[in-house]
């Protein structure tokens, strides 16, 4: 009996379908399915630096010009525009935000032996848009209390969870959204003194050293081995850097046109060793808060007294929680799942 042959067009369709399935499987593995591990490649030194808390009656220590192990680090942040798009800071936006009348309301003022945290809600109107943001003024007794956590306690791609869930799992007092390291292969990831990845890609990198100092680096100026030798405690890769290391807004940012626009935001800032700012700006909520541009965020961090500041993953991911309760107002009530958080552990 003679077999019926399929027409050429049917064979072509079948080949295309098979190819599409193969491509889909590859994309599923690379970009959707979780790929994780709990093992780091190297450990840096422990964060043993100790700081006097304000209630203990000691003044703030001056910022050190050295990183971790006392190996000389740059006395100011490194700037280069070779690897990423250079977008000028918008002076009109900066001026409008700086001139906006801010109303501050204290929400939380908590003191423990580990940390002293004061969270304020600040409201203002700039460029005819309402803005609501939350600034956590954080003093820690040791750098070891500025901690990070991965979603599901796993390092890897496509592993996500809500900020609230990660905060609860890690018994955090204060927690904010992190840098979403798991969305890219080109990131430097150092967390709680453990090295997971050394590749900075093309984004600015922010490093918190074990001595409590914090510095930002352009990707072209960043060397992972150097900062590890200097005692890197945390390293984040999202950006851009928002201030120049001396409390000034830079002339330009390493960013994208989209990121520069009005968005909800999360940022971390450095005032002095042991003294930091965690900031979340609500946005994309008509009549409540629009969000801020990158230039406005930089001015905000300057007004908060920071010398160095760094933009974290914002948008729907931006969220702040304290003792399990939402401080900010994430989009949709819970926000979006994310790879990681930055947090201060609760007193046990």
Regions found by a protein language model. Give the residues of each.
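Conserved, well-ordered active-site substructure
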Residues: 185-201, 208, 253-307, 312, ...
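Zymogen propeptides
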Residues: 2-200
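Active-site-adjacent helix-turn-beta-strand microarchitecture at beta-sheet edges
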Residues: 111, 181-259
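Short beta-strand segments
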Residues: 137-139, 176-178, 209, 269, ...
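Short, solvent-exposed aromatic-acidic interface loops
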Residues: 151-155, 221-224, 281-286
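Beta-strand-turn-beta hairpins that frame and shape the catalytic cleft
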Residues: 131, 143, 213, 271-277
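General beta-strand structural signal in soluble alpha/beta enzymes
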Residues: 174-178, 216, 308-314
């Amino acid at each position: 009996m003679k077999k019926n042959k399929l027409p050429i067009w049917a064979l072509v369709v079948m080949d295309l379908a098979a190819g599409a399935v193969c491509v889909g499987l590859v994309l599923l593995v690379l970009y959707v399915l979780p790929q994780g591990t709990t093992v780091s490649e190297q450990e840096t030194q422990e964060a043993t630096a100790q700081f006097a808390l304000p209630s203990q009656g000691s003044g703030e220590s001056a910022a050190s010009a050295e990183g971790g192990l006392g190996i000389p680090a740059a006395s100011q942040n490194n700037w280069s525009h070779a690897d990423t798009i250079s977008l000028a800071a918008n002076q009109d936006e900066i001026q409008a935000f700086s001139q906006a009348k801010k109303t501050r309301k204290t929400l939380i003022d908590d003191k423990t032996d580990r940390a002293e945290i004061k969270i304020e809600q600040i409201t203002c109107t700039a460029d005819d848009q309402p803005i609501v943001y939350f600034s956590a003024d954080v003093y820690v007794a040791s750098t070891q209390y500025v901690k990070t956590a991965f979603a599901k306690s796993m390092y890897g791609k496509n592993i996500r969870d809500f900020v609230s869930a990660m905060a609860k799992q890690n018994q955090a007092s204060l927690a904010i959204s992190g840098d979403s390291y798991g969305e890219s292969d080109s990131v430097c990831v150092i967390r709680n003194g453990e090295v997971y990845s050394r590749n900075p890609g093309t984004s600015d990198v922010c490093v918190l050293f074990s001595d409590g100092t914090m510095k930002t680096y352009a990707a072209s100026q960043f060397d992972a081995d150097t900062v590890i030798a200097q005692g890197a405690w945390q390293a984040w890769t999202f950006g851009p850097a928002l201030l120049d290391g001396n409390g000034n807004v830079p002339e330009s940012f390493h960013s994208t046109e989209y990121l520069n626009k009005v968005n909800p935001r999360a940022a971390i800032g450095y005032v002095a060793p042991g003294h930091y700012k965690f900031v979340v700006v609500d946005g994309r909520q008509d009549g409540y808060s629009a969000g801020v541009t990158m230039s406005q965020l930089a001015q905000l961090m300057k007004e908060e007294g920071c010398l160095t500041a760094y933009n974290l993953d914002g948008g729907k991911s931006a969220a702040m929680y304290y003792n399990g309760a939402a401080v900010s107002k994430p989009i949709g009530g819970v926000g979006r799942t994310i790879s990681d958080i930055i947090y201060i552990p609760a007193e046990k």
